[in-house]
């Protein structure tokens, strides 16, 4: 197991390096400048600004300088938020996205798995049809449609919950964005769990357990659930990526000060340094999470330790 974990960590290094390289050159070679706007700056002023940020250096010089900065944990200066470095901006916004993303992810896993198991155990009953009907609805409706609907129903009409803001991450401010962000993944996980659980319940070892007279609850929790969760575990990597990218829309709709909204503002303002750093950060988190999923998969199913 230790060798497997070490190998996955080593495999992540070149992937991250390729991500950094591609992202850097795409940002640097993109047309336009972070300092061009509605008002055209005099050439002398533009030259001084570019010299300050070393944007007039050869592209390879900029690349190796950026790698050196990253090696020291420095994302560099922000081109638009002049009083803050990118590190400062990430440090203030990342906890918001991390708290919202973690809450949405665990909500999706818990409710999705529970609904899928219930649907599998009650196959071809009204419970099964209800869960699958709701799951299909949750899959086809995108989060940018769900989010305003939740605001309209629970904030404007019923006045039960606030329609935006963060307020330090208080629970009532998290409920609507958390539900909007996780709904599609609850539905997908429920469908995956149902199909996998039905397949496992028809396996020979489950028939043997039933023939021995074991209680159904014990059969489900100790024998059926573990193998049934393997497809769900495989889906967690894409779900994590989807929650990260989906948070950009959700944070903008609900006015949350997270990295999603920061990324959108950076892209609109052509703050290439900020956008590049957030791209690398999200990519690194995705690579790390996928490595963790692979390790968990190996723990549950030792057959994949190759």
Curated annotation (Swiss-Prot):
Periplasmic side: 33-99, 159-169, 251-279
Example of a GO biological process term: oligopeptide import across plasma membrane
Main localization, broad class: membrane
Keyword Transmembrane: yes
Matching Pfam families: BPD_transp_1 (PF00528), BPD_transp_1_N (PF19300)
Keywords: Cell inner membrane, Cell membrane, Membrane, Peptide transport, Protein transport, Transmembrane, Transmembrane helix, Transport
InterPro entries in alphabetical order: BPD_transp_1_N, MetI-like, MetI-like_sf
GO cellular component, one term: ATP-binding cassette (ABC) transporter complex, substrate-binding subunit-containing
Gene3D superfamilies: MetI-like (1.10.3720.10)
Localization (cell): Cell inner membrane
Protein name: Oligopeptide transport system permease protein OppB
Species for this entry: Escherichia coli (strain K12)
């Amino acid at each position: 197991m230790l060798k497997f974990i070490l190998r996955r960590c080593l495999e992540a290094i070149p992937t991250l390096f390729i991500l950094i390289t591609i992202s850097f050159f795409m940002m640097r070679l993109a047309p336009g400048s972070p300092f061009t706007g509605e008002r055209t700056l005099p050439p002398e002023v533009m030259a001084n600004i570019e010299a300050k940020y070393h944007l007039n250096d050869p592209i390879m010089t900029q690349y190796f300088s950026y790698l050196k900065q990253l090696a020291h944990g420095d994302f560099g200066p922000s081109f638009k938020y002049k009083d803050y470095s990118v590190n400062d901006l990430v440090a203030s916004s990342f906890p918001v996205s991390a708290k919202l993303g973690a809450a949405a992810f665990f909500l999706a896993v818990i409710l999705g798995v529970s609904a899928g198991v219930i649907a599998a155990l009650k196959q071809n009953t009204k419970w099964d049809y209800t869960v699958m009907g709701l799951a299909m609805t949750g899959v086809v409706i995108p989060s940018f449609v769900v989010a305003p609907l939740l605001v309209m129903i629970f904030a404007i009409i019923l006045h039960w919950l606030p329609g935006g803001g963060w307020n330090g991450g208080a629970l009532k401010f998290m409920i609507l964005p958390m539900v909007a962000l996780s709904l599609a993944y609850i539905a997908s996980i429920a469908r995956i769990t149902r199909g996998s659980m039905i397949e496992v319940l028809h396996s020979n070892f489950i028939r043997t357990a039933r023939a021995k007279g074991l209680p159904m609850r014990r059969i489900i929790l100790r024998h059926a659930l573990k193998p049934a969760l393997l497809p769900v575990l495989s889906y967690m990597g894409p779900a994590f990526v989807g929650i990260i990218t989906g948070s950009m829309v959700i944070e903008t709709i609900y006015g949350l000060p997270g990295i999603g909204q920061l990324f959108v503002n950076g892209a609109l303002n052509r703050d290439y340094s900020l956008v590049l750093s957030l791209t690398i950060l999200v990519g690194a988190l995705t690579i790390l999470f996928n490595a963790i999923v692979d390790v968990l998969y190996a723990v549950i199913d030792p057959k994949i330790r190759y």
